[in-house]
């Protein structure tokens, strides 16, 4: 059983978008293979949410900029004594490769947008109970196909996201590992500090405290208020130790 809980909070809009995309892509694989109506609705709802996120911003452009920025950061480490040069070069090649694949890929989510079944289900998701068999006979018969046939179609859908997934995973991994966790202490449930142009806050709390953070701020400055899960009887200690990484 976990004894600590990790919380992550974005400090700018691009990071907020990336974390949402990462979350939705992870959700797509949780209930695979799809064998029933509940699993299908979970899958298609996450597909629909993902397409909505894609339509709100320049996801590809921002990721390509970040891939280039990370390459420049790695270049600055090349001449530092004691640095693993082979590791640096391997990461640079991964970033370069991910950028090449992403820039040459079709519009992100285009294959999913143009799929007839996905489009039909998306139209009904906002209607309470709108995905019944009489509303969506197409989905109904799809769920009665051979499992292998459904699996193959889902694999094709997910494969269309691979250029995005590869680049996003690489970028987020580098950002998350760009700063170590350090012990901090809040006073009367409150903590604030400078962001130092960070993109992401990562905060570790012990589970037995049953507290959660409410975080506000941006890349220059942020504030954390610790709240009890039990809003009526829970207590926040005068001094609370936690671990924080500004990435």
From Swiss-Prot:
Known role: Cell division factor that enhances FtsZ-ring assembly. Directly interacts with FtsZ and promotes bundling of FtsZ protofilaments, with a reduction in FtsZ GTPase activity.
SUPFAM superfamilies for this protein: YacF-like (SSF160950)
Cell division among keywords: yes
Tagged with keyword Cell cycle: yes
Source domain of life: Bacteria
Assembly and binders: Interacts with FtsZ.
Main subcellular location of this protein, as a coarse class: cytoplasm
Cellular component GO terms, alphabetical: cell division site; cytoplasm
Pfam families associated with the record: ZapD
Compartments, record wording: Cytoplasm
Similarity comment: family membership: Belongs to the ZapD family.
Organism encoding this protein: Salmonella newport (strain SL254)
Swiss-Prot/TrEMBL keywords: Cell cycle, Cell division, Cytoplasm, Septation
Gene Ontology biological process terms in this record: division septum assembly; FtsZ-dependent cytokinesis
NCBIfam families: PRK05287.1-1 (NF003653), PRK05287.1-3 (NF003655)
Name of the protein in question: Cell division protein ZapD
């Amino acid at each position: 059983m976990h004894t600590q809980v990790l919380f992550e909070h974005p400090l700018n809009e691009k990071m907020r978008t990336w974390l949402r995309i990462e979350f939705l892509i992870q959700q797509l694989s949780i209930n695979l293979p799809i064998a029933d109506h509940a699993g299908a609705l979970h899958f298609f709802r996450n597909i629909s949410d993902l397409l909505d996120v894609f339509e709100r911003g320049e996801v590809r452009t921002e990721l390509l900029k970040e891939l280039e920025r990370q390459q420049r950061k790695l270049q600055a480490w090349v001449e530092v004594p004691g640095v693993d040069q082979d590791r640096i070069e391997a990461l640079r090649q991964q970033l370069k490769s991910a950028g090449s694949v992403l820039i040459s890929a079709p519009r992100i989510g285009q294959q999913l947008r143009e799929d007839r079944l996905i489009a039909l289900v998306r139209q009904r998701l906002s209607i309470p109970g709108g995905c019944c068999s009489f509303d969506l006979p197409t989905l109904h018969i799809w769920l009665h196909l051979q499992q292998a046939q459904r699996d193959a179609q889902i694999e094709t859908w997910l494969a269309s996201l691979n250029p995005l997934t590869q680049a996003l995973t690489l970028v987020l991994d580098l950002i998350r590992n760009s700063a170590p966790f350090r012990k901090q202490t809040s006073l009367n449930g409150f903590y604030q500090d400078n962001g130092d142009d960070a993109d992401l806050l990562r905060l570790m709390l012990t589970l037995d405290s049953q507290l959660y953070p409410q975080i506000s701020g941006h890349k220059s400055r942020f504030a954390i208020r610790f709240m009890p899960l039990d809003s009526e009887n829970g207590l926040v200690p005068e001094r609370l130790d936690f671990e924080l990484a500004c990435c």
